[in-house]
Each structure stands twice: as structure tokens, then as C-alpha cells.
């Protein structure tokens, strides 16, 4: 087992990893930018190293400075968290080249799954259902049109190197096709430096279902059930829950088997997530595999009782999984609300500032993952997510009621958050009944804004 780990991240995920390491008697090294010198993860770690200026490119994306910090402080491994360098194959390879362990999959696997069109081909070969679309890339309008004529409208044009909803456009007719293609291609080039594109049939009103995978370095691959991540705004998740209300035991078994096949087909190791869309007729299709720990991993921890961060560290140290698929059972229901420093009633504008006072919810079945504290000044340079409120209860309805209580207890003074919008969603009849898909926010936002006045 590792004696010391560097956490190549910031915010609540860095705090989360530090806490797991402390419970495993592993020393931790935090990195920070000059904007984060008073951050909570810096205070909690055993050691902390400044790796650059406020801009992410100068600090949290500064590969050489991060690896130098790890080597000079005597670390054996680097945990990348999520975001920043977590899915950067060059970083993963560089870490290994420098004699350290990257807590995640191999760089070549990150490459293969990061290219969405290649990942699609890999899944077809592994026997995993994929949405009808192009076999490989479409890099000219003529190639695109030829595929679309076969699969029909509507379609979704996507960047092969894409993620986070960028480099992606819908087209409902031929009139929209060329503009959608050129716009998505230009955005992909600007965001990822790669304008390789592919196209899929657009699945209308889908649910976004993902399966948590654990794969050790001894060939053992299992899944830990699913998460329903359908409550999204502009392809960014807001509320996640586990398990999914609409999945029966038979469908869960089939989708779980497909998720395991996907990981096996990719030669995957460590924690990963296989994402599917589920249509209105319960047909499911692979969309991508995320090669890192997810923001929403706590809800899987709540229903399985398995600490995913500790499992990542155990796997990276060479230990085999200590449980088998038949040992995994889902107990009760868990919901997570992402608390962002933004104003949902004014076009979700960012709202950084100083936290003048904070009170976190408590009581049975309530967990809060955050890096906030009273007096902390939120930097302007980074992601707006400041906390995750997670609840667990015996049933879904009890979990909804528990989350309402938790949100009503949460007080963060000095900055505006999306807490009120989350509270509204949890009172929407369609949400309570489980009648929602990825267009839920888009459909109900105006109504919720008008209710807020």
C-alpha cells in the first residue's frame, strides 16, 4: 500500500480524497494555486505545495510542476480527482514514466475511450448496444449527409474528443444540418484542438443512466449498479439519484452486463463509469465511458456501502477486488444535489464572493461534501460547484423528503447559489412521480423562475 499520495486537484473532491487517505493511514500532499492558498484542502493535507498562479493552465494543469511536487515530497502515487488532468492520457503516461502510480486507467485506455468515435467502434466489437450512426468519423458535410440519409432525422452531431456538452449540436432537418455541423466542428476545434466529428441518431426525451464500474489489475470487473443523471441543464448534471426508478431487475441486469462488457472490451482498470441513454421504450444505448471518479460517486457509496475512493487506491496499489458481483446489493435510495455558486433566476450567472456565514444540514442519512467554510472567499477562476448535498433513506419518497429538509437547513450567506431551484425541482409532481428525462429543466425552468418572482 502507498505511504504518501499527491492529490492533483482542488475543492471538495480534494477534501474527499484526503479524508479517505487519512482513514487508510496514508499521508497526503495537496497542490494549490496562489488563488487557493487558504483553501480547505490545503489546510487538511499533511503537506501542501504551490504549483503556480491562479489560472488553471499555470497550476492545476501544470503537469511538470505537479509531478515535480510529487517526486520532491516522496509520494508514490497521484490521484487526479475529476476535471483538470483526470482524463489527460499524456499526464497519466508521464506520471508512470516518472516512477509514480497514476490512480486511474492506463494512458492508452484513456486515449481509446476519450475518442468518442473510436470508443463507439470498440463497443460495437464488444457487443454493447450503440445508437445508430456513423461507423467512425465524418469529417466532411458530404460524409455526414450520406450517413444521415441512412439513419434519418433528428440527429446529434458530436465531437470525437468532446465532453461536458461542448462540440455538440442537434439537427432536426436538412435545413439545419450544415449549420449544425460547421458550428459543432468549430466549437470542437476551439475547445479541444480537434475537430474530428461523428453523428448519431438523436434519441428524443431519453433518460441518462450510468453504471459504476470497478476493475482491478487481475482481470476482475464488476458494476455497482446505476445512477439516474437525467436532471440536467445544458448537458450539465444537477440532481442525481440511485437506483433509477424506472429500471426493473431484468433491465438492470442487462444494462449492468453491458457495462461490464464495455469495461472488459476496453481493457479498463480502476473506477470508471459507463454512460447510456434509455429511450421511452426502455431500449438502451452506450454513449461514452468516463475514465475517472464521477462528481456523483457518493450516491453509489450510500446505496452499496462501498467507499469508491478507497477502492481506487486499493486497485492502484495492486490489490484485487475484495468482493464479487453477487456480493453487491443496493440498499435504499440516495439523491445528490449539486450546489453551485450561480443565480438560476438570472441566466445562471456565476456568483463568487466571500462566505460570511455557513450552516450545513445534518441528521440521519445526510452527508455534505464541500470545501466551503465561514470566511472563505470563493475564487473566480474555477468551477462554480461549491458543495454536494447527499441523502440516503429506505425509499425514494423518503429520500426526496429528506433532501427537502436538508436543503431547507442549508445556509450559505454571502454568495448566491442554485439551492432554491433544487428545492423547487424536488416539489415538482413529475419529479416526485419519476416522470422526467434530460429535457426536464428546459421544460420546467420558466415555470419555476416565474414562481420565484
Model-found features: residue ranges?
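Conserved beta3 strand of the protein kinase N-lobe
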Residues: 133-134
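A short acidic, helix-capping loop that chelates divalent metal ions and anchors anionic groups
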Residues: 165-167
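ATP-binding N-terminal substructure of ATP-dependent carboxylate-amine bond-forming enzymes
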Residues: 1-125, 138-146
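Alpha-helix initiation/capping motif
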Residues: 59, 84, 112, 137, ...
Amino acid at each position: 500500500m502507498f505511504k504518501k499520495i499527491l492529490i492533483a486537484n482542488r475543492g471538495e473532491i480534494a477534501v474527499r480524497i484526503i479524508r479517505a487517505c487519512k482513514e487508510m493511514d496514508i499521508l497526503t500532499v495537496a497542490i494549490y494555486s496562489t488563488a487557493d492558498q487558504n483553501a480547505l484542502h490545503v489546510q487538511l493535507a499533511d503537506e501542501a505545495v504551490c504549483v503556480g498562479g491562479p489560472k488553471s493552465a499555470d497550476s492545476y494543469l501544470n503537469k511538470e510542476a505537479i509531478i515535480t511536487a510529487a517526486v520532491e515530497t516522496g509520494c508514490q502515487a497521484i490521484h487526479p480527482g475529476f476535471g483538470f488532468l483526470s482524463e489527460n492520457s499524456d499526464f497519466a503516461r508521464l506520471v508512470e514514466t516518472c516512477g509514480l502510480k497514476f490512480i486511474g486507467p492506463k494512458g492508452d485506455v484513456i486515449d481509446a475511450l476519450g475518442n468518442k468515435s473510436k470508443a463507439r467502434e470498440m463497443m460495437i466489437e464488444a457487443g454493447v448496444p450503440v445508437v445508430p450512426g456513423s461507423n467512425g468519423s465524418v469529417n466532411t458535410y458530404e460524409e455526414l449527409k450520406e450517413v444521415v440519409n441512412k439513419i434519418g432525422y433528428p440527429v446529434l452531431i458530436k465531437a470525437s474528443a468532446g465532453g461536458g456538452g461542448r462540440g455538440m449540436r442537434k439537427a432536426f432537418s436538412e435545413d439545419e444540418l450544415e449549420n449544425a455541423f460547421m458550428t459543432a466542428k468549430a466549437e470542437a476545434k476551439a475547445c479541444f484542438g480537434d475537430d474530428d466529428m461523428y453523428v448519431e441518431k438523436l434519441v428524443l426525451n431519453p433518460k441518462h443512466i450510468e453504471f459504476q464500474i470497478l476493475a482491478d489489475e487481475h482481470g476482475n470487473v464488476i458494476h455497482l449498479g446505476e445512477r439516474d443523471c437525467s436532471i440536467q441543464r445544458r448537458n450539465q448534471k444537477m440532481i442525481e439519484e440511485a437506483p433509477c426508478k424506472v429500471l426493473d431487475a431484468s433491465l438492470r441486469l442487462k444494462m449492468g452486463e453491458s457495462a461490464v462488457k464495455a469495461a472488459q472490451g476496453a481493457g479498463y482498470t480502476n473506477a470508471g463509469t459507463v454512460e447510456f441513454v434509455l429511450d421511452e421504450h426502455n431500449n438502451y444505448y452506450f454513449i461514452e465511458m468516463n475514465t475517472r471518479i464521477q462528481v456523483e460517486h457518493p450516491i453509489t457509496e450510500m446505496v452499496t456501502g462501498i467507499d469508491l475512493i478507497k477502492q481506487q487506491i486499493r486497485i492502484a496499489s495492486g490489490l484485487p477486488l475484495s468482493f464479487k458481483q453477487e456480493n453487491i446489493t443496493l440498499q435504499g435510495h440516495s439523491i445528490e444535489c449539486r450546489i453551485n455558486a450561480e443565480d438560476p433566476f438570472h441566466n445562471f450567472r456565476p456568483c463568487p464572493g466571500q462566505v460570511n456565514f455557513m450552516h450545513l444540514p445534518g441528521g440521519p442519512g445526510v452527508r455534505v461534501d464541500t470545501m466551503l467554510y465561514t470566511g472563505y472567499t470563493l475564487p473566480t477562476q474555477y468551477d462554480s460547484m461549491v458543495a454536494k448535498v447527499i441523502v440516503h433513506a429506505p425509499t425514494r419518497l423518503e429520500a426526496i423528503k429528506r433532501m427537502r429538509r436538508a436543503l431547507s437547513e442549508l445556509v450559505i450567506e454571502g454568495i448566491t447559489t442554485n439551492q432554491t431551484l433544487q428545492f423547487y425541482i424536488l416539489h415538482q409532481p413529475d419529479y416526485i412521480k419519476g416522470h422526467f428525462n434530460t429535457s426536464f429543466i428546459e421544460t420546467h425552468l420558466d415555470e419555476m423562475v416565474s414562481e420565484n418572482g
